[in-house]
Regions:
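Conserved class I S-adenosyl-L-methionine
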Residues: 114-122
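Class I SAM-dependent transferase core
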Residues: 71-110, 155, 445-449
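Mobile active-site "lid"/loop adjacent to the S-adenosyl-L-methionine
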Residues: 150, 185-227, 243-250, 269
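Helix-to-beta-strand junctions that scaffold the AdoMet/dcAdoMet cofactor pocket
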Residues: 137, 232-234
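S-adenosyl-L-methionine
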Residues: 147-181
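Polybasic, low-complexity RNA-engagement segments
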Residues: 1-44, 300-468
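Class I S-adenosyl-L-methionine
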Residues: 184, 237-240, 244-348, 352-354
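Conserved SAM-binding loop of SAM-dependent methyltransferases across substrates and taxa
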Residues: 125-138
Length: 468
């Protein structure tokens, strides 16, 4: 898509980068297509590799090509396929993410091996949160937040499909985290910005760009950081990132954090072949991606550590909440506390159960742990979250294998027939759970979440395959 760049942007890039690098950037933005990349989900285990390497029945197959060098299990694709029609995407087998933003992996690997409680502040649609959840210590709790309601629902969907139980999804503004004083070891703030990294993908981003908007974004970004800063522990780490190139929203804000909030910049070693500019810019024309800036900072130790006050969890009155069958506990593996919230059974990681009341007191929680089951009349119906979770004990439910066409019908929430016993059945595609049906014999009730269904009546057959 040809792009006409604003003259002020061209001048700014020449001043900031120099004439030759600025020309390479602008030529790439104006005359080349966006790259396409995905990350595989290792938490789905052997199923991911096995499923993605199976011979494909649909006519369109896209193979993974070159690896993204700064992120494990990440690959470029030669072109952008119709991801919607790949059942493996809906099963959480992989996530479509812009390659430059995967550089977050280097910060996680190098500095976050002992992180216990992590906040992704502006997390929708979920690219960085799924990456964090993959590479953080297995027992760490990740709070993935998004203030905008519609985007928060998308975030909750993507985190559910990724399937890790030590996750909590919230819908809050940055200021809501201020009372959670010194709760988080790491805060990732991929802040709203002027969107220069979207120029190749979105013509509106080009049309909306102006120096006035850049400076407004800078002010907003500083306000966001000041609001959330009290929630970061002394000595904790802040990942500050944008999808812009300009210094006002990038380096100038990093200097402001160090000067006004109290922090130091940490070094992230880079391979010279990656083409990373400075600390740390990914520029189209130099790196294979859409554009990204990231800086990792450590909060100064001078502020006395003040653990957040414990909150006593309210116990339901006798008879107020229904009991649930003990057998539900055997549906998942791992150490969990089992809770009943509004006719829903939740398995929450025991290692962070003491923190849960505090988080629920201050935050609007959309999803947490593993939603096991919902009470439907007198029947406990297994939840879709359970089907997606890596904690699910396979073999708990009868399973039915779906063909490609049957899988798409299921994902459209159409009627499907299964050769399985009556009752709740886990339907799969290439070994990957897609969700549940309730088999009634002559027919099966489709239990796929209505709001997540494929709405398109057309089909462009596609599955991802491995050739690396």
């Amino acid at each position: 898509m040809p792009v006409n760049l604003p003259s002020d942007f061209l001048s700014l890039m020449c001043q900031q980068l120099g004439e030759a690098p600025a020309k390479a950037l602008c030529d790439a933005l104006c005359s080349t297509e966006p790259s396409v990349s995905v990350r595989l989900n290792p938490w789905k285990g052997v199923e991911v590799r096995a499923a993605l390497s199976t011979a494909s029945s649909p006519s369109a197959v896209s193979s993974l090509s070159a690896p993204v060098p700064w992120c494990p299990d990440a690959y470029y694709l030669p072109e952008r396929p119709a991801f919607t029609f790949d059942p493996q995407l809906h099963a959480g087998a992989y996530y479509v993410q812009e390659a430059s933003s995967m550089f977050l992996a280097q910060a996680i690997i190098r500095y976050m091996s002992s992180a216990s409680v992590v906040l992704d502040l502006c997390a929708a649609p979920g690219g960085k949160s799924t990456l964090l959840r993959t590479l953080l210590p297995d027992g760490a709790l990740l709070v993935s937040n998004e203030p905008v309601a519609r985007r928060a629902q998308v975030l909750a969907e993507n985190m559910t499909k990724w399937g890790h139980p030590s996750t909590l999804v919230t819908q809050n503004f940055p200021a809501d985290f201020s009372p959670l004083r010194h709760v988080f070891d790491v805060i990732v703030a991929d802040v709203p910005c002027s969107g220069e990294g979207m120029f190749r993908k979105d013509a509106e981003a080009v049309g909306e760009w102006s120096m006035q908007n850049v400076l407004m974004c800078q002010e907003r970004q500083r306000s966001i950081l000041a609001d959330v800063w009290p929630a970061l522990k002394p000595g904790g780490q802040l990942v500050y990132s944008t999808c812009t190139f300009n210094r006002f929203e990038d380096e100038d804000n990093v200097d402001w954090i160090c000067r006004e909030l109290g922090a130091e910049v940490l070094d992230i070693p880079c391979n010279e072949a990656w083409g990373v500019t400075g600390h740390y810019h990914f520029l189209p024309g130099t790196t294979r991606g859409e554009g990204f800036f990231l800086s990792l900072l450590r909060k100064s130790d001078g502020e006395p550590l003040q653990p957040a006050a414990a909150v006593r969890e309210r116990r339901p009155k006798p008879g107020r909440e229904p009991a649930f069958p003990a057998a539900l506990r055997s549906w998942v593996r791992g150490e969990f506390d089992f809770l009943v919230e509004s006719d829903t059974v939740i398995a929450f990681p025991s290692s962070h159960a003491s923190l849960r009341p505090l988080l629920r007191r201050h935050l609007h929680v959309l999803a947490e742990g593993v939603c096991l089951a919902e009470l439907k009349g007198r029947d406990w119906q297994p939840a879709h979250s359970l089907a997606m979770s890596r904690a699910l004990v396979r073999g708990t439910f009868p399973e039915a294998v779906l063909t490609y066409d049957e899988a798409l019908a299921y994902l459209r929430r159409e009627a499907v027939s299964v050769a399985a016993p009556r009752g709740y059945v886990l339907v799969t595609f290439r070994g990957l759970p897609l969700g549940f049906v309730k088999n009634l014999g002559p027919r099966a009730n489709n239990l796929y979440p209505t709001e997540w269904r494929i709405r398109s009546g057309f089909t462009t057959p596609f599955v991802l395959s491995v050739s690396v």
